[in-house]
A protein has these predicted regions:
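Glycine- and small/polar-enriched repetitive beta-structure motifs of secreted/surface proteins
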Residues: 1-112
Length: 112
Protein backbone atom coordinates (compact mmCIF):
# COMPACT_ATOMS: atom_id res chain seq x y z
CA UNK A 1 0.00 0.00 0.00
CA UNK A 2 1.31 3.43 -0.92
CA UNK A 3 0.47 4.97 2.45
CA UNK A 4 2.63 2.46 4.31
CA UNK A 5 5.67 3.55 2.31
CA UNK A 6 5.24 7.09 3.60
CA UNK A 7 4.37 6.31 7.18
CA UNK A 8 6.63 5.17 10.00
CA UNK A 9 5.19 3.68 13.13
CA UNK A 10 7.43 3.41 16.18
CA UNK A 11 10.54 4.08 14.10
CA UNK A 12 13.85 4.58 15.90
CA UNK A 13 17.15 2.76 16.35
CA UNK A 14 17.97 2.13 20.00
CA UNK A 15 15.47 4.45 21.65
CA UNK A 16 12.64 3.09 23.76
CA UNK A 17 8.94 3.85 24.13
CA UNK A 18 8.78 6.25 21.17
CA UNK A 19 5.76 6.64 18.91
CA UNK A 20 6.08 8.08 15.40
CA UNK A 21 3.52 8.49 12.66
CA UNK A 22 4.29 10.42 9.48
CA UNK A 23 7.00 10.55 6.86
CA UNK A 24 10.39 11.38 8.43
CA UNK A 25 8.96 11.71 11.94
CA UNK A 26 11.66 10.81 14.50
CA UNK A 27 13.90 10.02 11.51
CA UNK A 28 17.26 10.74 13.22
CA UNK A 29 16.33 9.32 16.63
CA UNK A 30 19.10 7.29 18.26
CA UNK A 31 18.75 6.79 22.02
CA UNK A 32 15.92 9.18 22.89
CA UNK A 33 12.98 7.71 24.77
CA UNK A 34 9.37 8.52 25.48
CA UNK A 35 8.79 10.79 22.46
CA UNK A 36 5.56 11.13 20.53
CA UNK A 37 5.70 12.52 16.99
CA UNK A 38 2.71 12.80 14.65
CA UNK A 39 3.02 14.55 11.31
CA UNK A 40 5.39 15.03 8.40
CA UNK A 41 8.91 15.66 9.79
CA UNK A 42 7.69 15.94 13.39
CA UNK A 43 10.80 15.64 15.60
CA UNK A 44 12.70 14.73 12.42
CA UNK A 45 16.20 15.72 13.64
CA UNK A 46 15.76 14.51 17.22
CA UNK A 47 18.63 12.28 18.35
CA UNK A 48 18.71 12.10 22.16
CA UNK A 49 15.99 14.51 23.32
CA UNK A 50 13.43 12.61 25.40
CA UNK A 51 9.86 13.03 26.60
CA UNK A 52 8.80 15.40 23.80
CA UNK A 53 5.42 15.64 22.12
CA UNK A 54 5.27 17.03 18.56
CA UNK A 55 2.00 17.07 16.62
CA UNK A 56 1.69 18.75 13.23
CA UNK A 57 3.58 19.37 10.00
CA UNK A 58 7.25 20.00 10.93
CA UNK A 59 6.43 20.39 14.62
CA UNK A 60 9.73 20.48 16.56
CA UNK A 61 11.52 19.49 13.32
CA UNK A 62 15.01 20.72 14.29
CA UNK A 63 15.01 19.50 17.89
CA UNK A 64 18.11 17.42 18.62
CA UNK A 65 18.61 17.13 22.39
CA UNK A 66 15.83 19.30 23.82
CA UNK A 67 13.64 17.46 26.32
CA UNK A 68 10.23 17.74 27.97
CA UNK A 69 8.80 19.97 25.23
CA UNK A 70 5.34 20.11 23.68
CA UNK A 71 4.78 21.53 20.20
CA UNK A 72 1.29 21.24 18.75
CA UNK A 73 0.49 22.89 15.43
CA UNK A 74 2.11 23.36 12.04
CA UNK A 75 5.79 24.23 12.62
CA UNK A 76 5.23 24.68 16.36
CA UNK A 77 8.59 24.97 18.14
CA UNK A 78 10.15 24.10 14.76
CA UNK A 79 13.61 25.66 15.29
CA UNK A 80 14.12 24.44 18.85
CA UNK A 81 17.35 22.44 19.09
CA UNK A 82 18.30 22.15 22.77
CA UNK A 83 15.56 24.04 24.61
CA UNK A 84 13.59 22.26 27.28
CA UNK A 85 10.26 22.41 29.12
CA UNK A 86 8.60 24.58 26.45
CA UNK A 87 4.89 24.38 25.65
CA UNK A 88 3.72 25.75 22.28
CA UNK A 89 0.17 25.49 20.97
CA UNK A 90 -0.74 26.95 17.56
CA UNK A 91 0.56 27.21 14.03
CA UNK A 92 4.18 28.43 14.12
CA UNK A 93 3.93 29.05 17.86
CA UNK A 94 7.45 29.44 19.24
CA UNK A 95 8.99 28.54 15.89
CA UNK A 96 11.87 31.02 16.42
CA UNK A 97 12.88 29.63 19.82
CA UNK A 98 16.13 27.66 19.51
CA UNK A 99 17.51 27.15 23.03
CA UNK A 100 14.88 28.64 25.33
CA UNK A 101 13.42 26.94 28.35
CA UNK A 102 10.17 27.03 30.30
CA UNK A 103 8.27 29.12 27.72
CA UNK A 104 4.56 28.80 27.05
CA UNK A 105 2.70 30.25 24.06
CA UNK A 106 -0.82 29.80 22.73
CA UNK A 107 -1.99 31.05 19.34
CA UNK A 108 -0.86 31.35 15.77
CA UNK A 109 2.67 32.82 15.57
CA UNK A 110 2.78 33.34 19.34
CA UNK A 111 6.45 33.82 20.30
CA UNK A 112 7.20 33.02 16.65
Amino acid sequence: MQILQQTTIGANTTGASNTAFGKSSLKANTTAAGNTAFGFKALCDNTTGSLNVAVGFSAMRLNTTGANNIGIGKEALECNTTGYENNMFGNEAGDDITTGFQNTAVGSNALG
